[in-house]
Design a protein with these regions (language model features):
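N-terminal Lys/Arg-rich, disordered targeting/topogenic segments
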Residues: 1-2, 269
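Solvent-exposed, non-transmembrane regions of membrane-associated and secreted proteins
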Residues: 3-244
């Protein structure tokens, strides 16, 4: 009886340890796979819209952005303003505006309205009150996501970005390229570097820093440049997982199962 009990305990310990070991890898893979599907669904929705409908939505967003420049308290929205904001660039009704690709760190993530916690857990949030991601002179789009989650990479490696690196916003039929020109660390409530600058087309990515402490905010700002790179087929993390990693995980699981079965048979003799 004691032998069987010790075997059961050994199995439970093994399974628990293996689960803890594999959770970050498996969870991040699952989230990346989900992101790939979300982006594919978004692309399908865009393909079904007429050019006229897509242009009409872009025009609405451009008009909205024009009204922000004169709104000093634009980062604090009333209920009616929030409702109007959420109705823009929302073709499929999910709140997805488009998606961002960052080749330097292998990121391809959906962009949603607001920076609510539920959004930042799974993708990239658009800071309400900042310019919508359609570009144009006198605009400043601000996007955010979490860093250091065990379940998803998201903006975990944003600190690897350097001046000169380029990231892309895919919104409706547009692919907007931004080249990093400024990197800063600020207090959580410091919006000074997020202001609209006359004549400039800017986009800032931000996340928490330092890693695991999260007392400040890392800002990575880019200015609009000509899109000369063919990066439309950037492979999402889920599709480019190293085969050696997958093989190692499968091998470890099979070895563990085989070892447990061997111990059970040996004790049963």
């Amino acid at each position: 009886m004691r032998k069987h009990m010790s075997t059961i305990i050994a199995i439970l310990v093994f399974i628990t340890g293996l689960s803890l070991l594999l959770y970050p890898t498996v969870s991040n893979y699952w989230n990346s796979l989900h992101q790939s599907r979300v982006v594919a669904n978004y692309s399908d929705t865009m393909a079904k819209l007429s050019k006229q409908d897509k242009q009409a939505e872009i025009d609405r967003a451009v008009e909205y952005n024009s009204s922000l420049a004169s709104n000093g308290g634009r980062f604090t929205l009333s209920e009616s303003e929030l409702s109007e904001y959420k109705s823009l660039l929302n073709a499929d009704g999910t709140g997805m505006m488009g998606y961002i690709t960052i080749p330097k760190i292998g990121v391809k993530l959906a962009i949603y309205h607001t920076v609510d916690e539920s959004v930042l857990q799974v993708g990239v949030g658009h800071l309400e009150g900042s310019s919508l991601p359609v570009g144009g002179s006198g605009t400043h789009c601000v996007l955010s996501s979490h860093r250091g989650l065990p379940s998803a990479k998201l903006f975990t490696e944003l600190d690897r970005m350097k001046k000169g690196d380029v990231f892309y916003l895919h919104v409706y039929d547009r692919v907007l390229a931004y080249q990093v020109d400024n990197i800063a660390i600020v207090e959580p409530n410091d919006y000074g570097l997020l202001e609209i600058e006359e004549g400039k087309d800017l986009c800032t990515l931000f996340t928490c820093t330092p890693y695991g402490i999260n007392t400040h905010r890392l800002l990575v700002r880019g200015h609009r440049v000509e899109n000369v790179m063919d990066e439309k087929n950037l492979t999402a993390d889920a599709a480019r997982v190293n085969p050696l990693v997958v093989a190692s995980i499968i091998g470890l699981i099979l070895y563990g199962i085989g070892y447990v079965v061997y111990r059970i048979k040996k004790r049963g003799v």
